[in-house]
């Protein structure tokens, strides 16, 4: 077996409509068609990467689990989020690898901005 890429990430959220708006309006994802699956959710895309939001009643965000978005300019990305009312940590350097900072979506899922050092 040879895997070619990650097709999508599935993310549980408390309110699919609210979180869909966040991922589209704040982070720049696009909505893509989603079949009726019998529960609320949304399929979103950024380029050829997909994010599937699944509404889970009583959802509580997991601790420590996260995924990262690569950015060319972490300060500009952080400023954009902050002007949209998103609380974002200060960027920190991780060894000789990258700059990173963290924020949460409306359901409390932890997300990361990641800029390669030297970029």
Report the location of each language-model feature.
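Short glycine-enriched loop/turn motifs at secondary-structure junctions
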Residues: 3-5, 59-64, 94-95
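Mid-chain, well-packed structural core segment of small domains
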Residues: 67-79
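C-terminal "cap" of GNAT-fold acetyltransferases
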Residues: 3-5, 37-51, 104-107, 117
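Structural preference for long, well-ordered alpha-helical segments within the folded cores
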Residues: 21-22, 80, 107
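Vicinal oxygen chelate
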Residues: 1-2, 32, 83-119
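Core segments of cupin and vicinal oxygen chelate
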Residues: 10-50
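Short acidic/glycine-enriched loop/turn segments that link adjacent beta-strands
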Residues: 37-40, 61, 95-99
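N-terminal beta-strand motif that seeds the catalytic metal site of vicinal oxygen chelate
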Residues: 1-18, 65-67, 117-119
């Amino acid at each position: 077996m040879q895997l070619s890429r990650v097709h999508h990430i599935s993310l549980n959220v408390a309110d699919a409509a609210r979180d869909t708006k966040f991922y589209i309006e704040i982070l720049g994802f696009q909505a893509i068609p989603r079949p009726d699956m019998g529960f609320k959710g949304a399929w979103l895309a950024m380029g050829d990467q997909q994010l599937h939001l699944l509404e889970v009643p009583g959802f509580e965000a997991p601790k420590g689990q996260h995924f990262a978005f690569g950015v060319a300019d972490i300060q500009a990305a952080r400023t954009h989020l902050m002007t949209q009312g998103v609380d974002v940590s200060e960027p920190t350097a991780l060894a000789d690898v990258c700059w990173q900072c963290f924020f949460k979506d409306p359901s409390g899922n932890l997300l990361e901005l990641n800029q390669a050092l030297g970029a």
